[in-house]
Amino acid sequence: MSFSRSAADAADTLPDLAATLGAPAERAFVTLGDAFHTRLPAAPLAAPYVVGFSDDVAQLLDLPPAIAAQPGFAELFAGNPTRDWPAHAMPYASVYSGHQFGVWAGQLGDGRALTIGELPGTDGRRYELQLKGGGRTPYSRMGDGRAVLRSSIREFLCSEAMHHLGIPTTRALTVIGSDQPVVREEIETAAVVTRVSESFVRFGHFEHFFSNDRPDLLRQLADHVIDRFYPACRDADDPYLALLEAATLRTADLVAQWQAVGFCHGVMNTDNMSILGVTIDYGPFGFVDAFDANHICNHSDTSGRYAYRMQPRIAHWNCYCLAQALLPLIGLQHGIADDDARAERAVDDAQAVLAKFPERFGPALERAMRAKLGLALEREGDAELANKLLETMHASHADFTLTFRRLAQISKHDASRDAPVRDLFIDREAFDAWANLYRARLSEETRDDAARAVAMNRANPKYVLRNHLAEVAIRRAKEKDFSEVERLAQILRRPFDEQPEHEAYAALPPDWAGSLEVSCSS
C-alpha cells in the first residue's frame, strides 16, 4: 500500500495507516505463535501531543510529512487508536531473556514496548513499528510500562543522529508527549517514542528459548530470522552456524563504528543486542566529550563494564552468549547420530566463528581511523599512529569530536596551522611530538592538504548529540517549547557539514555539562 504524500490527503491517510499496521498477513513475527509474544492493547495516554517528528523516517515509510499535524496522529502513536483493535491486529510484546551486566537475568521481555505492526519501506524493505512507553505488559516486572519525556527525546534524537552518521541503527518516527505524571527519581511526564526497524529480535530472544530447553521454538525463531533477513545463510552447509557468523561479523563492524565516533552505548546487555547488528535501545548512552578511554556514560554502571574501551570486548562476549544459545541447532545438517559428538563439533565450529570477531573488528576500526586521519594509503604503522593520538588525547582529556574534526586543518609542511587542534591539548609538547609523526606520515600521501581535508571532513563529524545539547532541548520541551528538539534534529541530519550558522552546537561543552548524569532510569 502506498500513502498519498499531499497535505490535503494527510487526514485520509490515518485510517489507512492504522488498518495497514494491523494487517495480519504482514506481521511476520506474530505468525511465530503465542510462545513468542503476548498480544494486548496499549495503555491510553491522556491528551497526547507531538513533540518531535522525523520527515526522513516518514519518507522511508511513504507517509506524508503533513500527517503529523493531523489530530489523530498523536492518538495513534500514543497507543490510543481511534478504533478498537481487532484481535488479529492487537499490538504485542515479545518475550526474551538475557544477561544483564554479565549476570544471567532470566526472563525479561518487552516491559514497556508494544509492536503495532509493520509498513513497507520505499527502499523495498519492511519495517516494524514499536511504541516504547506503551504501558505495562506481562514482562514489565516491577515497572510501570511507561517511558518519560526525557529519555524519549534522547532516543528520538540519537536514533536519527546515528543514522545520519552512517551507523546502523533503529530509527525513530515520532515522540508523543503528555502531561501524565510518572515517578522516577523525581516526578516526570510520560511519553512514547515510535521505534522503526526491520526487526527487533535480540540475542536475548535466542537465549530465552535455549534456557527454557525449547529447541523446537529456537529453530523456529532462527528460521524466521534466516529466511527474512539472512537468506544467504540458507544455502550454507550449516545455516545456523552461518547465522551466528553473520551476526558476529555485523556486530564487530557496528562496534568499530561506535568506537570511531566516540559513541558509548551504556548498557550492552545481551537483551540489548540486535540480531541484525544495528544499534538498539538508546538509554544511558553518550558521546565522549573530553576523551577518556575509560569513560563510563551510564551512572548506574559502577563497575565500568560498559566503558568506552570495554565495548569491543563486551560485544565479543555477547556473541559468545548468542553462540551458546544456537548450539542446539549448529551441526544438525551433518547427520551425526551421536549427540555428544555433534555437540562437541558444534562447540568447535562456533568457537571458530567467534574467533573471527577480532579479525573483523581490528581491520574495520583501522580503516575507520585511517579515514579519520586522512590516510588514503595503507601503511604498517597506521594503527600505532592512531593509538598514539588516542593516548595523547586521553592524557590531555582533549575533546574527541573537535580533535578529529580539526585535524583536517593540519598542513603537511606548516606547523603554524596546528593551533586550532593543538589548543585542545593540555600537554602541548606531547601533541607536537605526535603532530611531527603525523606530518611525516602525511608526506607519504599523494593528496594535497585541501583534498585530504575534504576527505577527512567526510569521516569526522562536526556535530554529534552531546548530552548538554539534548538537555537543553529536553528542558525546553518540558515547558512545551519543542523548537529546540526540531532545531537539533535538523542540525544532526547533516553532521559532516560546516553549518556556520550553528557553530555554537559544535563548541566545547559548557562547564555545567560536567554535572549531567544519565542512568538506566528512564
UniProtKB/Swiss-Prot annotation:
* Coiled-coil residue windows: none
* GO molecular function annotation: AMPylase activity; ATP binding; magnesium ion binding
Q: Per UniProt, which keywords does this protein have?
A: ATP-binding, Magnesium, Manganese, Metal-binding, Nucleotide-binding, Nucleotidyltransferase, Transferase
Is Manganese given among the entry's keywords? yes
Question: Tell me, what does this protein do in biology?
Answer: Nucleotidyltransferase involved in the post-translational modification of proteins. It can catalyze the addition of adenosine monophosphate (AMP) or uridine monophosphate (UMP) to a protein, resulting in modifications known as AMPylation and UMPylation.
Q: Which residues form the active site?
A: D271
So what family is this one in? Belongs to the SELO family.
Binding of ATP, residues: G109, G111, R112, K132, D144, G145, R195, R202, D281
Q: Which reaction does it catalyse?
A: L-seryl-[protein] + ATP = 3-O-(5'-adenylyl)-L-seryl-[protein] + diphosphate; L-threonyl-[protein] + ATP = 3-O-(5'-adenylyl)-L-threonyl-[protein] + diphosphate; L-tyrosyl-[protein] + ATP = O-(5'-adenylyl)-L-tyrosyl-[protein] + diphosphate; L-histidyl-[protein] + UTP = N(tele)-(5'-uridylyl)-L-histidyl-[protein] + diphosphate
Asked if the keyword Zinc belongs to this entry, the reply reads no
Task: Please name the top-level EC class of this enzyme.
Answer: transferase
* Name the UniProt record assigns to this protein: Protein nucleotidyltransferase YdiU
EC numbers listed for it are: 2.7.7.-, 2.7.7.108
Q: Which InterPro entries match?
A: SelO
Superkingdom in the source lineage: Bacteria
Which residues make up the binding site for Mg(2+)? N272, D281
* Cofactor(s) listed in the protein's UniProt record: Mg(2+); Mn(2+)
